Amino acid sequence: MARARCGQRFFSPPESSFQFGLLAHDAGFKEPPHYHKSVTRLIDDLQQMFVVQRGVVAVELYSDDGELLREVILKAGDAIVLIHGIHAIRVIEDMQCISVKQGPFLGLENDKVFIDFKK
């Protein structure tokens, strides 16, 4: 008899201000109705998640000194969670994606710092 799947596994450290994980439950599982407590949290490092709906996009991940560490190609249905660090996107095919990050939004002037790495 197969063991029932019931649980969650989070991949982010507990202290991270952006939590992501995997929920796995067998058919018939029901979580009781609930809401999440209102707790004041200090967020000083914005995290972001992209879910590509259509098209193709390259996500470039950089070290703090400008070294390209990795390039990840995402297609429709793919997702990436950016916890910390410098990143860029390069659109390969016309794309549309969902972007999720913490709020509130404080305006463009407070949102991004653009880096010009000299090659």
Model-derived regions: residue spans:
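Glycine- and acidic-residue-biased ligand/ion/polar-headgroup-sensing regions
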Residues: D26-A27, D45-Y62
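A short, compositionally biased micro-patch
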Residues: D26, V52, K75, L82-I83, ...
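A short, N-terminal "cap"/entry segment at the start of jelly-roll beta-barrel domains
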Residues: M1-A24, F117
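Short beta-strand His + acidic residue motifs that chelate non-heme Fe in jelly-roll/DSBH
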Residues: P33, V59-E60, I80-L82, I86-I92, ...
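Double-stranded beta-helix
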Residues: R90-K119
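Conserved short histidine dyad/triad with adjacent acidic residue
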Residues: L22-D44
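Short acidic-glycine-tyrosine-enriched beta hairpin
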Residues: S63-H84
